Amino acid sequence: MTINRRELLGYGAAALGATVIGLPQIAKAAGELTIAYNVNLPSWDPTTGPSAVNPTIQGLYQSVFDQFIPQKPDLSFAPGLLTEWGWNDDRSKIMMTVREGVTWHDGSPFTAEDVVWSLQRAGDEKTGNPIQFVWKNVNNFKIDDNKITGDVVQFDPVYFKWMSFLTGYIMPKAYYEKVGAEGFEKAPIGTGPYMVDKFERNAFLRLKANPNYWGGKPAFENVTIKFVTDAASRVAEIESGSSQVTLEIPYEEYDRLIAKDGLAGSCNNVSDIGMIFFNDIDVMLDRNVRQAAVMAVDKKLLVDRLLRGYGQPIDTLETPEYEAYDPSIKVEHNPEKARELLAASGYSPEKPVKFTIQTTKGFKPKDYEMVQAIVGMWRKVGIEASIEVYEIAKHYELRAADKLAPAAFYNWGNAIGDPTTSTGFATYGPSPHSVWDSQDLIDMINPLWGEKDETKRVAGWKAVDKYIAEQAYVLPLIQYAQPIVHAKGVNVVQHVSGALLPALMTPA
């Protein structure tokens, strides 16, 4: 059996940035911590519905629930509720070993039955798991004490990686069957480091440390997470001392705040990227329009001027840390060529091509301002784009229904660094996470889903990335650096996935 515990990305301690250490101003009272969070939590089931694939709320889910296989802050795999996992030699079966002695938040024992039920539920189309097409690839599970085997229906090279990613959470079988979906929303339980004490939708979440957590009780006894979706309000929260930790604030505010007495921070590159979806509707069916829209954008200028040098430009949906990153794939910034392409389709600055671009505002640092700047760059070459602002939840709703505007800004998270979970799901037509449906790309990607030769698989994805860049099927923008500001009385470990985890925080 091959146990898949290899590190996915080449981060070491240095790449993580220092664990930021400071002194005084301990959170309000000993054992109390308040965090100003940037998004609301729409649902408590981390395995169903649009919220399950929202990378920005995974830190909340990971505080209450455990994933099958956890990731360390550098994104390497670690033993968790599964202590061993892997395939047999011909990849026809999987084997897993389940940690013993773990309890759910209600005191009931966690068992291998919970693992199997969670996997079967995730693979059932009726459940509503947005990643069901991955989980259905293994069935016929058998339990022998704390050992589990399953039959591979269709080989998926990233099956175990998904156990550390979106929807890869273990749910409580007996409790869920007892209370049902509605009861679970009212009183969720997991095996994670924190238990839900109180939850007010669109207001706050109060967590209480799990004294029986298998990984050790967290340092902070009580954690209050305020849902503060406005970036300026998050700045006020941390500056006033009302909150001791916040994230995703404008970079100029980050620089200003960490220079103040009593505050510190970290701002390292994470696995998130900023991108613009192109939907294969209306004017986006014209390759000249797409290529012009890509060539007109000066990504380096966006990073240097708008993001104050934080983050880095990208030309594909892969960052340098992802497995299929290919530095040879370059897309030039060439406004003159963009004008020529538009002219060939009958457009000019005097007679511009028109479409709508959708974006969030304050969800990520400078998201709206970045789109404003891009619209300005487009205007100079003959593209007139009108901006429509929406909440992130609306983006998921529209994307799942394939009803995004011709262009839509988005923050794509890929904590496992695999090309299937970046290029694959973002551009493969049948995926519920893509709005580009052209058959040429579908045909090119299809053989890669089940490719057993890892070298061939990664090379295949690199070829897909090159083709997408040539056809301008998407507009990759930047790899994000995530700003976190905190009181010097709190130590914060930045997680490369972008998840802000109170269980990793300690008093200084």
Regions found by a protein language model. Give the residues of each.
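N-terminal lobe/hinge region of extracytoplasmic solute-binding protein
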Residues: 37-89, 120, 189-190
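Gly/Pro-rich hinge or "lid" segments in bacterial periplasmic/extracellular proteins
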Residues: 62, 72-76, 165-218, 222, ...
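Surface-exposed binding/hinge segments that line
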Residues: 86, 97, 132-175
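Extracytoplasmic/peripheral linker and loop segments enriched in polar/acidic and small residues
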Residues: 92, 288, 384-395, 421-488, ...
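Ligand/substrate-recognition segments at binding pockets and active sites
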Residues: 201, 343-414, 428-429, 454, ...
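Append "and occasionally in soluble cytosolic enzymes with long acidic Gly/Pro-rich linkers
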Residues: 206-211, 259, 285-376, 380, ...
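Ligand-site clamp/hinge motif
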Residues: 210-256, 384
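Long beta-strand-rich cores associated with HINT superfamily self-processing modules
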Residues: 484-508
